[in-house]
Amino acid sequence: MANIKSAKKRAVQSEKARKHNASRRSMMRTFIKKVYAAIEAGDKAAAQNAFNEMQPIVDRQAAKGLIHKNKAARHKANLTAQISKLA
């Protein structure tokens, strides 16, 4: 454990940020899983609706630095391609 006051403060802030980031990352992954579930079920309308809910959330997390912007783009591109393949 840190002895210097500023180091103690940084440890507290770091832990708070870690918990916040974990929560946001989990929420984002849940929305992505909803899209995959709809694709697996073969329901194009549900998949498109789930994608429309997921897209701004992924973009927001990329803008805030939680994930890299290329990872967000990759998720969106892969899911869009899979949705377009559905009948």
Curated annotation (Swiss-Prot):
Family matches, as Pfam families: Ribosomal_S20p (PF01649)
Alphabetical list of HAMAP family matching this protein: Ribosomal_bS20
Gene Ontology CC terms: cytosol; small ribosomal subunit
Family recorded in the similarity comment: Belongs to the bacterial ribosomal protein bS20 family.
Assigned keywords, A-Z: Ribonucleoprotein, Ribosomal protein, RNA-binding, rRNA-binding
Transmembrane segments: none
Protein's name in the database: Small ribosomal subunit protein bS20
UniProt region (Disordered), positions on chain: 1-26
Molecular function GO terms recorded: small ribosomal subunit rRNA binding; structural constituent of ribosome
One Gene Ontology biological process: translation
Organism whose genome encodes this protein: Enterobacter sp. (strain 638)
PANTHER family xrefs: 30S RIBOSOMAL PROTEIN S20, SMALL RIBOSOMAL SUBUNIT PROTEIN BS20C
Taxonomic lineage: Bacteria, Pseudomonadati, Pseudomonadota, Gammaproteobacteria, Enterobacterales
Summary of the function given for this chain in its UniProt record: Binds directly to 16S ribosomal RNA.
Gene: rpsT
Source organism superkingdom: Bacteria
Gene3D superfamilies per record: Ribosomal protein S20
